[in-house]
Amino acid sequence: MMNKKDARLRRARQTRAKIAELKVNRLTVFRTNSNIYAQVFSECGTKVLASASTVEAEVRKELEGKGATAAAATVVGKRIAEKAKAAGVETVAFDRAGFRFHGRVKALADAAREAGLKF
C-alpha cells in the first residue's frame, strides 16, 4: 500500500521524466511544514544554477521568521527569478515535485512568472 509521501514521489518521477525529455532548465520546488525551497537545475539535471529558500538570512529578515506562508513563497519566487536571470536563465520547466499546484507552490510559481521567468 502506498502512503502519501510515496505517491508524491511517484508523481514527481513522472514529471521529471517528461521534463528530462524536453532538455530545458528545471525550476523545482520543495515544501516542508516550516520552509519552502526553490532551485533551478541545468538542462542535464546535474548542476544547480540558482537557489532560493526561506532559510536564507535576507529572506528571514524580510519575513520576520515566518517561513511557511504564501507570502514567504512569493518572496522566494521573486528571488529565484532574479537569481536565475542573473545566471542567464530565461525559460524553465516548472517541477512541482508531486505537490499540488495550490497554496504556497502556486504563490511561488506566480511570483516567479511576475518577476520575468517564463514557464
From Swiss-Prot:
Source taxon at top rank: Bacteria
Gene3D superfamilies linked: 3.30.420.100
InterPro entries the UniProt entry points to: Ribosomal_uL18_bac-type, Ribosomal_uL18_bac/euk
CDD domains hit by this protein: Ribosomal_L18_L5e
Gene Ontology biological process terms from the UniProt entry: translation
A cellular-component GO term for this protein: cytosolic large ribosomal subunit
Keywords from the named record: Ribonucleoprotein, Ribosomal protein, RNA-binding, rRNA-binding
Signal peptide from the UniProt entry: none
One Gene Ontology molecular-function label: structural constituent of ribosome
Cited Pfam families: Ribosomal_L18p
Family to which the UniProt record says this protein belongs: Belongs to the universal ribosomal protein uL18 family.
Quaternary structure annotation from Swiss-Prot or TrEMBL: Part of the 50S ribosomal subunit; part of the 5S rRNA/L5/L18/L25 subcomplex. Contacts the 5S and 23S rRNAs.
Known function: This is one of the proteins that bind and probably mediate the attachment of the 5S RNA into the large ribosomal subunit, where it forms part of the central protuberance.
Protein name, entry field: Large ribosomal subunit protein uL18
Species per Swiss-Prot/TrEMBL record: Cupriavidus taiwanensis (strain DSM 17343 / BCRC 17206 / CCUG 44338 / CIP 107171 / LMG 19424 / R1) (Ralstonia taiwanensis (strain LMG 19424))
